[in-house]
Amino acid sequence: MQQPRPIRRALLSVSDKAGIVEFAEALSQRGVELLSTGGTARLLADAGLPVTEVSDYTGFPEMMDGRVKTLHPKVHGGILGRRGQDDAIMGQHDIKPIDMVVVNLYPFAQTVARPNCSLEDAVENIDIGGPTMVRSAAKNHKDVAIVVKSSDYAAIITEMDNNDGSLQYTTRFDLAIKAFEHTAAYDSMIANYFGALVPAYHGDTEQPAGRFPRTLNLNYIKKQDMRYGENSHQQAAFYIEENVQEASVATAEQLQGKALSYNNIADTDAALECVKEFAEPACVIVKHANPCGVAIGDDILSAYERAYQTDPTSAFGGIIAFNRELDAATAQAIISRQFVEVIIAPSISQEARSLLAAKQNVRVLACGQWQQRIAALDFKRVNGGLLVQDRDLGMVSEGDLRVVSERQPTAQELRDALFCWKVAKFVKSNAIVYARDNMTIGIGAGQMSRVYSAKIAGIKAADEGLEVKGSAMASDAFFPFRDGIDAAAAVGISCVIQPGGSIRDDEVIAAANEHGIAMIFTDMRHFRH
């Protein structure tokens, strides 16, 4: 059985100095000798702590502008030396055991994320000594504790106090895992950065540098295990990025309710990303990753009421997302009207939380307010590979539109067209959305032919008794034939917004003119598979 190991000597060298003075002080108060380097050593000395510079300890100065500091046998021998096995050779060379290494690495990711970061800047932020010490300590975790996260400082001090200044083997093992994860993620970032530069450095002007590296290394942190995946025979877990910058389902705090399922998370993401498209108070109701009702209003209560009207049947057991704080009136309207799986909003008022507490099975998430949408990559696994593309942040404004029909859209038709175009972006292809007065009235999703999506949208509107005449229709991609326009005209659509680009555009435009429909081209497609 592995024994607890006392901490008598620690080497501290950190880039992120949050909490390091307090941690070092706590170690010193418990009799731990402190070794340190560079800026960390100066910080500790300025705080009045007894600290020995590594250069004084090794008798070898820092050199090459700090490139060589800790790469010395007295450092790595002290870390890698096996207690009880290498003691004689360590004594022969005056190598003292180092029982704890506290290191985090140069901020490479933050450096290369800066606009106009040069290759020289990137290179100078590649840590060499840090990862070497981290790996050495993690390798010898039987005898050495390696600390790479400031969030572990408090727990380490508590355990030392409970174990006469020692750390248990299980703790050292867990810390070693974090250390290997830390260096793996760090090396992955460097490999991705340099891999993305390959085309430019080989004279390939067709492939933009900085987007798609030669090899792609992904690092995600497990947030939770799940009872099962999309289906009950599939195991699943939820992994998140380490430093998520945009409010999302990954950052959301669950305030109540059962654990989120795989499908809950997928559907909640779809709802939240859709509602982010709107500046006005908006509500999106999602079922099976497709919006089934979307509306904007003077406030979120009116937005919810109108979104629900689109398809009350599908809204049952759905996911509801808002882009404003959830208030008590809206919470009451939801729980008195329907069964809901998840509600997500930037924040939840205390009054709304009190009301929702009576429905403990409802999962309630507060995700925080988003200031902007972050450009990132999207991934889709295929058997044996991974498709990678830019996240679809594209959206048109009124100035981007081209009216291609004889009739110009009215101001109201134009507003409705832009509204349902935003919704169509989040509907599975082939996608057709009918909208009127900033409210969806029919959604046709995921059909193999576009005309059937148009027909389904009309059927949905008719089933709910919603007036289609004078409404706008959005299509996520071009119409390959005129039949979709004929189907829209048959139910009273007066304005169509679509990307255009079909070899039969002239035929489709002619159909719009025959029916007196205003037709708008966006010149932007929003396939969603």
Swiss-Prot record:
The gene is purH. One of its GO terms (molecular function) is IMP cyclohydrolase activity. The IMP cyclohydrolase activity resides in the N-terminal region. Its EC number is 2.1.2.3, 3.5.4.10. The keyword Transmembrane does not apply. It comes from Serratia proteamaculans (strain 568). One of its GO terms (cellular component) is cytosol. HAMAP family: PurH (MF_00139). It catalyses: (6R)-10-formyltetrahydrofolate + 5-amino-1-(5-phospho-beta-D-ribosyl)imidazole-4-carboxamide = 5-formamido-1-(5-phospho-D-ribosyl)imidazole-4-carboxamide + (6S)-5,6,7,8-tetrahydrofolate; IMP + H2O = 5-formamido-1-(5-phospho-D-ribosyl)imidazole-4-carboxamide. PANTHER family: BIFUNCTIONAL PURINE BIOSYNTHESIS PROTEIN ATIC, BIFUNCTIONAL PURINE BIOSYNTHESIS PROTEIN PURH. Gene3D superfamilies: 3.40.140.20, Methylglyoxal synthase-like domain (3.40.50.1380). This is Bifunctional purine biosynthesis protein PurH. It comes from the Bacteria. Residues 1-148 form the MGS-like domain. It holds the Pfam family AICARFT_IMPCHas. Belongs to the PurH family. GO terms for biological process: 'de novo' IMP biosynthetic process. Keywords: Hydrolase, Multifunctional enzyme, Purine biosynthesis, Transferase. Pathway: Purine metabolism; IMP biosynthesis via de novo pathway; 5-formamido-1-(5-phospho-D-ribosyl)imidazole-4-carboxamide from 5-amino-1-(5-phospho-D-ribosyl)imidazole-4-carboxamide (10-formyl THF route): step 1/1; Purine metabolism; IMP biosynthesis via de novo pathway; IMP from 5-formamido-1-(5-phospho-D-ribosyl)imidazole-4-carboxamide: step 1/1.
